[in-house]
Amino acid sequence: MNPAVDNEFQQWLSQINQVCGNFTGRLLTERYTGVLDTHFAKGLKLSTVTTSGVNLSRTWQEVKGSDDAWFYTVFQLSGQAIMEQDERQVQIGAGDITLLDASRPCSLYWQESSKQISLLLPRTLLEQYFPHQKPICAERLDADLPMVQLSHRLLQESMNNPALSETESEAALQAMVCLLRPVLHQRESVQPRRERQFQKVVTLIDDNIREEILRPEWIAGETGMSVRSLYRMFADKGLVVAQYIRNRRLDFCADAIRHAADDEKLAGIGFHWGFSDQSHFSTVFKQRFGMTPGEYRRKFR
């Protein structure tokens, strides 16, 4: 390997790690190219990667050493790329989109010249809009699909408008999630009866979200199953019952805060949705949304 080429590659890899999270990398050929352009506009965090002859990977070691609170939403602009995750492999071409989970290992291959945009989509945003589903990754959304074309246009318009406010950037991300909904659906392998049972459970949770009695034992009794079966049902979807309930309460709190009057007490909102301890409410809210309830309110004012 030409030392000059290897040195240039290591510098580019260092840039990738600073902006996109930890990756290991190797050259597939000495005919390597690598350019990274970043774009941060309020809530939008994205990178344009132009490269060829490169393989980047995230093993469990890299995952543990970096922020995993994101999904990489990959918009292919030109050329081709191969993405691997969860024992799936997909080849994407110009105009296609795919999704990769930053919390799990993945591998990316660019044999020939390729240009793509990677948009960091917050995990909490996906969970807010799709609380009952586990996103499927390394799945190609074809460029011919109207919603894919709309997503590309929305991304380009957002990038070309540096004056977007925090609220407008947040709205753009929310619109992106809605447009990409098909790729965020987990293709279920379970029997229809089991899926209907799961939907019954999550509906029961939402209908009783403010009640103190809302615990796994009560839910199991109301839906005619054992607590163990309830836990297993949620685990099959990558969920934990108690955490799911807490996150749903926090999602309702966040929505209430966005629409609350300026003089409405934040502690009162938390209490209304089942958080009797103000300090605990502030702590878990920040864990989920990256800011305190007060900071969250100011963000939407």
From Swiss-Prot:
Q: Which residues bind DNA?
A: 217-238, 266-289
Keyword Transcription regulation in the entry? The reply is yes
Alphabetized UniProt keyword annotations: Activator, DNA-binding, Transcription, Transcription regulation
Q: Single GO molecular-function term?
A: DNA-binding transcription factor activity
| Record-level GO BP terms | positive regulation of DNA-templated transcription; regulation of DNA-templated transcription
Domain HTH araC/xylS-type stretches: 199-299
- Domain of life where this protein originates: Bacteria
Recorded hits in PROSITE patterns, A to Z, give: HTH_ARAC_FAMILY_2
**Cross-referenced NCBIfam families:** PRK09685.1
- Output the PANTHER family linked to this UniProt entry: HTH-TYPE TRANSCRIPTIONAL ACTIVATOR RHAS-RELATED, TRANSCRIPTIONAL ACTIVATOR FEAR
What is the role of the protein in this entry? Positive regulator of tynA/maoA and feaB/padA, the genes for 2-phenylethylamine catabolism.
Name by which UniProt lists this protein: Transcriptional activator FeaR
Q: Gene symbol?
A: feaR
